[in-house]
Amino acid sequence: MGCMSSKLVPEGPSGNQAVVEVFNNERNKEYNRQNPHQNRGPRDPTKDPKNAGPPPEGQRSNRKVKKYRDKFDPRVTAKYDIKALIGRGNFSKVVRVEHRVTKQPYAIKMIDRVQGKEVFESEVAVLRRVKHSYIIQLIEVFETKDKVYMVMELATGGELFDRIIAKGSFTERDATRVLNMVLDGVKYLHGLGITHRDLKPENLLYYHPGHDSKIMITDFGLSSTRKGPENFMRTTCGTPEYIAPEIIARKPYMCQVDMWAVGVITYILLSGTMPFDDENKTRLYRLILKAKYSYAGEHWKDVSAQAKDFIDKLLVVSPGDRLSAADALKHQWLISNAASSSNKNLHRTISQNLIHRQSTRANSTKSAKSTRSTKSNKSNRSGRSLRSEHRRVMPDEIDELHRDPDVQADLASLG
């Protein structure tokens, strides 16, 4: 049986507030300064009744808040004032709340206890164990017969790549700073026997809007905890573009799958493109099985050899040959940071690639909605967003993949 996640997706435009799950107490004032109009709807541009359109966004938002407030357990609403709906998933909703006494802002994830059982049990079990500077913190949990309410810190800095697009510059030095934080958190998790299994840019959030903000690892719905030294995982789960070859090959696997994902993230971080990219799942998975990627393109000429070496030591088919989190932190590219990492501004290329993929993905989605034909599997490498909230690895598609003769040959070559 495959893992399924209630990955959160943005509800819609709401200022510059991203779907976020982390925050820390001392940032409350900064949060309020950054979001002074969080609960205000747009002004009515005209009072002419004939120009009246749909209710203002603020009114719709208030109705949604009331709708979800009514669904919350009284114990929760007695302690927390629900302010806004900020995200939703397959079996979950996330709201921004304020502690009624301290006025601290938090996020509460409300999960359907039956449909989201696998997700909440995994996430709660992990978050109750961890306490790390670069990992989301669970504050408390309320449970009823039908629902689970997870109270978590709230981050206000947005997703990793949103910040890069908005930032005026981005260098390898900036990339190594981000990766040092991510790897420090991953090393901590692996030391506890915890494998995240869904590391990707959407799950790396900035702590606050400031330029010196740290990165936080979030969303542990697919995570797994090792029961013993030889305890392997076998569940087919993850996000297609970030999944490791051993999962596709249906081999027993361990925490090295997270390091493969870090390699994919690093590649994207330095180029704004994915190392393995194809709309057709079979072709995509075959690229991953062979670790078939390249540094083609003008933008890669500006990336140092050390950075490419770092990626090459992570995107290795054999898990045993992949860098561990501890070893990755010792790689010369990360250690030297300012000394050896290139200071060339990569921002223009990266942001253009990210924006292009996001805009073409949006246009592609609109086109798909206007036609009944959904059977085409033609590759569309330039038209796919880096966001992957609804793209999950499904066990049945891996079953079908293994019936393909070409894939069988690829698997045989892996041994």
From Swiss-Prot:
Annotated GO MF terms: ATP binding; protein serine kinase activity; protein serine/threonine kinase activity
Lineage: superkingdom: Eukaryota
Enzyme Commission number: 2.7.11.1
Biased composition annotated in UniProt, kind: Basic and acidic residues: 41-50, 386-406
Biased composition (Low complexity): 363-385
Residues the entry annotates as binding ATP: I86, G87, R88, G89, N90, F91, S92, K93, V94, K109
Annotated InterPro entries: Kinase-like_dom_sf, Prot_kinase_dom, Protein_kinase_ATP_BS, Ser/Thr_kinase_AS
UniProt keywords, alphabetically: ATP-binding, Kinase, Nucleotide-binding, Serine/threonine-protein kinase, Transferase
EC top class, as a word: transferase
Family according to the record: Belongs to the protein kinase superfamily. CAMK Ser/Thr protein kinase family.
Protein name according to UniProt: Serine/threonine-protein kinase H1 homolog
Gene name for this UniProt entry: PSKH1
